[in-house]
Structure formats: structure tokens, C-alpha cells
């Protein structure tokens, strides 16, 4: 009997010694394996991302091959053609990245803002939008200055550019600084009021300074990890931290573009990862939620990320073909005289113009009268560039020959 009590006492003593020495680790393990474990950053080996190399390797090889083919194809083209391809891809990237978050930007304002900053002449003037200017600044810094060191100040500058008024919609937010938990924890929630579903809860604000410092160090670190994999890791890591009151998704995708540009090692962007993510928006959120609630094995996330990156590169054929067709058009009509309005509309018409071109749309695009629009269009018909289709209210115009 005495022996049993001695053994119980010894076991109790060893348990308390273990808790005293390894208390934090034991607590973390309970969170890992017990009911309290919910999110990836609660893993005791948080930051030590793992993946199965054999599942990733073939994807990397396929992507490298597709990258090489695309860059080789574009490299032989002239300066103006490459600039127009860059303009088109950056425009799509910015629009689609914002669209993922439910924000719809005017394509022509975005395009005009990028063109102005890159010194590309697209003809005509387009009004400036404060919302557009900020996101364009961020994307151009990420892709044109891709080799620059990432710093807290640079990242905070991106955030400030996204929210120049200090408001997100009607709500005042903390701009140019990491979030706090003054109004409660940062959560990703869906559903109507009273029926909300919490998909994810980010780490407490009091650890963000250290966590973001670790992430920034990782971005800048020179190591053997392929930039394609690093882009996927940084995307996940940043979204997991959700360091700002708003704009986290757009900044995560800007960081992704920066690292993909490092992989390509050129300022020219000929494919849009954000456009591909937008196409698969539901599965994007699903895989993020699953990964954010899992272990440090992020193989499934990286497979999803790399598969969609490969599709994005392969899908760039449509974009590059549009640019090439435009170049061929302007080369063919290099000696033809066009006024500024005609140049503006012709360029827009060749950029996947939505709907039919009418005199009313022409007048609106060029801020001119319908009589002037009619004369402009009539001139293009006489030059055998446009043909008239339909009659009455259904009258519209299209290219005489396929572009």
C-alpha cells in the first residue's frame, strides 16, 4: 500500500516538474492535438513550413518550361509591343485583384494611370481616381522595383496608398500601421447579421510586430528555396497574419507578384496570377481556409498555387495575341492619318471591347457630340477599317477585317 502511494507521489512530482520545465511546450502540444488547436499559427513549429518535394517538383519543371517559352516569345518583340503587353497584363492584374475583394475598378482609368506612370502613350485623357492611383502605385512598386529590399516602411506605404482617405468604404481604419484588437480579434467572417460564420481568426495584435519582422526577414533572405515556392509561402503566411485592418488580400497578391517577378527576373509581366485566382475564387478561399486550420505541411496549398500559376502562364497566349494583333494593325496603318479620338477608340476596341460599338458609346468615350462621333466613324468606314452592321436602333460598327 505504501509503495503504491510512493509511486503516485513520484508520478505527481514528475508531472509538476515537467510542467514547470516544459509548460509552454506542453500547452502548445495540447493546442496542437487537443480541442483548443484551431489555426496554423498555433502549431509549436509555426514558421517551419513543410511540403512533399515529389508532388511539387514536376509542377516546378512545367512552370519553368512555360516561363521560358513565354519570355522567349516576348523577348524578340519590339520595345513598344512589350510595353503594351505589360500595360495590358498589369491592368488586368490590378482589376482582378480588386475584384476578388468585391471592389470593381474602371478598366480605362486603371490603364490610363499605369500608362502615365510608365510613360506609355495611349492617346486621350482619362479622369484620375484616387482609389485607382494607390493600387497602381503599389503594383508598380512591387513589379518594377521587384529587386528592392522589403521593409516594414515599404509595406506600410503600400497600405497607405490603398486607403488615402483613412477610410475603407464608410469605416475609418488604421492606415499605415498594423491593426490592434481594440474592437475585438481580427476574423474572416461570412453570412448575414446574426448568422455569421467565422472562417478564420488571425493571431493577436500584440505579436504582430515580431511576426511581421520574421516574415519580412524571410522575404529578404537569400536561400535555396525557389522563388515560385517562396511566393506561395509568403502569400499564405501574410494572409495568415492578416496584419492590417483591410487590404490584406490585395497586399498578399502584390507580394506574390513581386516574388514571381524575381523568379522571371524582368520588369515585364506577361501573365496575371490575380486573374487566375479570381477565376477560381471559391477554391482559393477553400484551400486557404483548410490550410490555415491545418499542420505545417502545406503541400496541398502549394500544389493549388503552382497549378493555378501554370494555368495563368499558359493562358497568357490570349493576352499576348491581342497585343500582337494591335501591333500588326498599327504597322499596317502606319501611314494613315487618324485623329486623337479615333486612336483612342481603336485601341479600346482592340482591347476586348465589351458589347457593340455605337455612335453613343463613341461620343461618351471621347466626350464629344454624336455628330462628331458619326463623322469619325464615317471616316473609318471610308478608310475600309469599319463596316456598319444593322439599322435603326440596332446600328453598330465593327472591324471590316478580323483583327
List the model feature ranges, each with a label.
Residues 2-403:
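FIC/Doc superfamily catalytic core
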Amino acid at each position: 500500500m505504501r509503495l503504491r502511494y510512493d509511486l503516485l507521489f513520484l508520478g505527481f512530482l514528475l508531472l509538476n516538474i515537467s510542467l514547470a520545465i516544459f509548460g509552454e511546450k506542453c500547452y502548445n502540444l495540447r493546442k496542437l492535438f487537443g480541442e483548443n488547436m484551431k489555426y496554423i499559427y498555433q502549431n509549436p513549429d509555426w514558421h517551419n513550413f513543410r511540403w512533399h518535394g515529389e508532388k511539387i517538383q514536376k509542377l516546378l519543371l512545367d512552370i519553368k518550361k512555360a516561363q521560358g517559352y513565354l519570355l522567349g516569345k516576348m523577348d524578340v518583340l519590339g520595345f513598344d509591343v512589350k510595353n503594351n503587353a505589360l500595360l495590358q497584363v498589369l491592368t488586368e492584374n490590378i482589376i482582378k485583384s480588386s475584384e476578388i475583394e468585391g471592389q470593381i475598378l474602371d478598366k480605362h482609368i486603371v490603364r490610363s494611370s499605369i500608362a502615365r506612370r510608365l510613360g506609355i502613350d495611349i492617346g486621350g485623357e482619362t479622369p484620375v481616381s484616387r482609389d485607382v492611383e494607390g493600387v497602381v502605385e503599389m503594383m508598380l512598386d512591387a513589379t518594377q522595383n521587384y529587386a528592392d529590399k522589403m521593409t516594414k516602411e515599404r509595406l506600410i506605404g503600400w497600405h497607405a496608398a490603398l486607403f488615402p482617405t483613412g477610410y475603407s468604404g464608410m469605416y475609418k481604419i488604421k492606415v499605415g500601421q498594423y491593426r490592434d484588437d481594440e474592437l475585438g480579434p481580427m476574423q474572416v467572417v461570412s453570412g448575414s447579421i446574426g448568422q455569421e460564420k467565422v472562417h478564420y481568426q488571425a493571431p493577436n495584435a500584440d505579436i504582430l510586430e515580431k511576426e511581421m519582422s520574421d516574415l519580412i526577414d524571410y522575404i529578404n533572405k537569400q536561400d535555396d528555396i525557389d522563388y515560385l515556392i517562396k511566393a506561395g509561402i509568403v502569400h499564405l503566411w501574410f494572409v495568415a497574419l492578416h496584419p492590417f485592418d483591410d487590404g490584406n488580400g490585395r497586399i498578399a497578391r502584390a507580394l506574390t507578384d513581386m516574388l514571381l517577378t524575381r523568379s522571371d527576373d524582368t520588369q515585364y509581366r506577361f501573365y496575371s496570377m490575380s486573374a487566375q485566382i479570381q477565376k477560381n475564387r471559391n477554391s482559393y478561399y477553400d484551400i486557404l481556409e483548410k490550410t490555415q486550420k491545418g499542420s505545417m505541411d502545406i503541400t496541398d496549398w502549394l500544389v493549388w498555387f503552382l497549378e493555378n500559376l501554370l494555368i495563368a502562364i499558359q493562358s497568357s497566349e490570349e493576352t499576348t495575341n491581342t497585343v500582337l494583333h494591335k501591333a500588326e494593325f498599327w504597322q499596317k496603318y502606319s501611314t494613315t492619318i487618324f485623329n486623337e479620338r479615333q486612336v483612342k477608340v481603336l485601341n479600346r476596341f482592340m482591347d476586348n471591347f465589351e458589347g457593340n460599338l455605337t455612335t453613343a458609346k463613341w461620343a461618351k468615350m471621347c466626350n464629344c457630340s454624336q455628330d462628331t462621333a458619326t463623322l469619325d466613324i464615317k471616316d473609318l468606314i471610308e478608310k475600309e477599317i469599319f463596316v456598319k452592321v444593322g439599322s435603326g436602333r440596332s446600328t453598330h460598327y465593327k472591324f471590316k477585317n478580323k483583327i
